Amino acid sequence: MDFKQYSPEELKECSMIEVVHSVLGDKKQATTFNELVQEIAQVLGLSQEQVNAKIAQFYTDLNIDGRFINLGENRWGLRSWYPYEQIDEEILPQPKPKKKRKVEEDGFDDYIEEDEDDFDDADVNEDEDDDVEDLDKVLEEEDGDDDDLDDLDEDDDDFAEEELEYDETEEEEEEEL
């Protein structure tokens, strides 16, 4: 479509989408979004402020309109240029086949009785018996510490009794009033 044949009034009535469709049809190759915006601004005589105000709606319209296709890397083309099968090939990256890993043997399956060590009671070291006796002595000493706790419990009981007596005295005084 040759835009020179249109008057400025007729160009202002054209939508940005119509202009892009004509521009891409004339070029017959995919073009980046920024280049498309510059060409629209030039054809329609839009200022940078006007372009900035309309760019979001234009991008939305470009995505929604079924005549256009995004080819990736911000390149746009006409859907009629690409058969359906070719679109899938160009847009989607080819999946790479995954390599199969070899299963490593963990060595647990092979059980050999020769490797098993028999455990005998004779192998127990006598030093371990001494360690147990030392622990018993420490525990007995700690049991003596419980007497101190018992004394503290008795003090708590005495304090609780004093509080009860004090509360009873207060209640009696309140009843008298």
UniProtKB/Swiss-Prot annotation:
Signal peptide: none annotated. GO terms for biological process: DNA-templated transcription; regulation of DNA-templated transcription. GO terms for molecular function: DNA-directed RNA polymerase activity. Keywords: DNA-directed RNA polymerase, Nucleotidyltransferase, Transcription, Transferase. The keyword Transcription applies. Residues 106-177 have a biased composition (Acidic residues). PROSITE patterns: HTH_HARE. Pfam families: HARE-HTH (PF05066). It comes from the Bacteria. One of its GO terms (cellular component) is DNA-directed RNA polymerase complex. Participates in both the initiation and recycling phases of transcription. In the presence of the delta subunit, RNAP displays an increased specificity of transcription, a decreased affinity for nucleic acids, and an increased efficiency of RNA synthesis because of enhanced recycling. RNAP is composed of a core of 2 alpha, a beta and a beta' subunits. The core is associated with a delta subunit and one of several sigma factors. Belongs to the RpoE family. This is Probable DNA-directed RNA polymerase subunit delta. The gene is rpoE.
